[in-house]
């Protein structure tokens, strides 16, 4: 029995599949927020059967209560929504990283992409890095097509633990012979919760790449407010300010060991502040 259920028509114009799911490479919840923002104007076209792909003891459903009364159970999901673009249409895969059946998910998604005539696959994610919130969010771009990779991207071999988004984008690209591009934001180690400046940067890059009109006013407002809260929290803490300024100035020239040490110092210092209202880890 297929684990991917079709929920609506998929008659689309030269669609691009964007994979933006929570999990291993979702630092600052950037992929989660990007996916939510993109699919807000979309329609559901497919979804994986939750009972087949999730272990509910580790990916638990949430129970919503209002004024003490239970109102709804929210189950983990992995779904695909469609939205109209100015040129190509867009399919957006969002949800939780499943606990099982990754290869079968990849195989069925590759078949779905073939049926929908997907022309490109775009993976979205974020990783904690030696960057400061005072900087523009750096983006790492990966691609199976050198023509789609900007000049200046480091070359060479790199082996890292794979997230489901890596598995899916690679196998769909490989099975169908279509290009795959990845946009990976680098977010500050020391910030907890959703990192809205990173969300804004990725949505800007993604909308330009897709030729998609995206209303970013709300996201820009969140990003501006978050930077202001971070600056205010540091205003009377010169030691933390100095550390973050040093991180911003030297991030590109620090050795991995020195950068890790500096980041550890910043994280420790900010955690020790003991202020529950600050947006620090």
Positions of PLM-derived features:
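Flexible, glycine/proline-enriched loop segments at strand-loop-helix junctions
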Residues: 21-25, 93-102, 151-159, 189-193
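Short coil/turn connectors at secondary-structure junctions
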Residues: 12-16, 87-90, 116-119, 134-136, ...
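Catalytic cores of processing enzymes, dominated by hydrolases/peptidases
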Residues: 130-213
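N-terminal short beta-loop-beta anion/metal-coordinating cradle
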Residues: 1-95
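Short, ordered loop/turn segments at secondary-structure junctions
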Residues: 50, 126-127, 188
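Hydrophobic/aromatic beta-strand patches that form the interior of the parallel beta-sheet core
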Residues: 46, 91-93, 122, 179-184
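Internal, conserved structured core segments that host functional sites
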Residues: 88, 96-147
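A conserved C-terminal secondary-structure "cap"
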Residues: 191-281
């Amino acid at each position: 029995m297929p684990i991917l259920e079709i929920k609506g028509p998929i008659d689309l114009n030269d669609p691009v599949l964007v994979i933006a799911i929570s999990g291993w490479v979702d630092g600052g919840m950037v992929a989660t927020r990007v996916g939510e923002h993109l699919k807000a104007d979309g329609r559901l076209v497919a979804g994986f059967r939750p009972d087949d792909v999730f272990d509910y003891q580790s990916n638990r459903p949430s129970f919503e209560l209002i004024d003490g009364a239970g109102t709804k159970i929210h189950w983990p999901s992995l779904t695909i929504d469609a939205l109209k673009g100015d040129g190509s249409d867009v399919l957006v895969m969002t949800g939780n990283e499943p606990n099982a059946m990754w290869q079968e998910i990849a195989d069925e998604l590759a078949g779905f992409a073939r049926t929908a005539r997907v022309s490109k696959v775009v993976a979205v994610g974020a990783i904690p890095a030696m960057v400061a919130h005072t900087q523009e969010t750096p983006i790492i771009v990966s691609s199976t097509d050198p023509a789609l990779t900007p000049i200046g991207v480091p070359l060479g071999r790199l082996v890292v633990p794979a997230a489901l988004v890596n598995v899916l984008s690679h196998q769909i690209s490989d099975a169908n012979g279509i290009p795959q591009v990845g946009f990976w934001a680098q977010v500050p180690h020391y910030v907890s919760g959703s990192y809205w400046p990173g969300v804004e940067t990725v949505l800007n890059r993604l909308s330009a790449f897709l030729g998609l009109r995206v209303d970013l006013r709300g996201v820009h407002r969140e990003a501006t407010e978050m930077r202001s809260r971070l600056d205010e929290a540091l205003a009377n803490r010169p030691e933390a300010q100095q550390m973050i300024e040093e991180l911003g100035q030297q991030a590109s020239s620090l050795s991995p060991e020195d950068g890790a040490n500096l980041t550890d110092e910043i994280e420790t210092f900010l955690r020790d502040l003991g202020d529950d209202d600050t947006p620090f880890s």
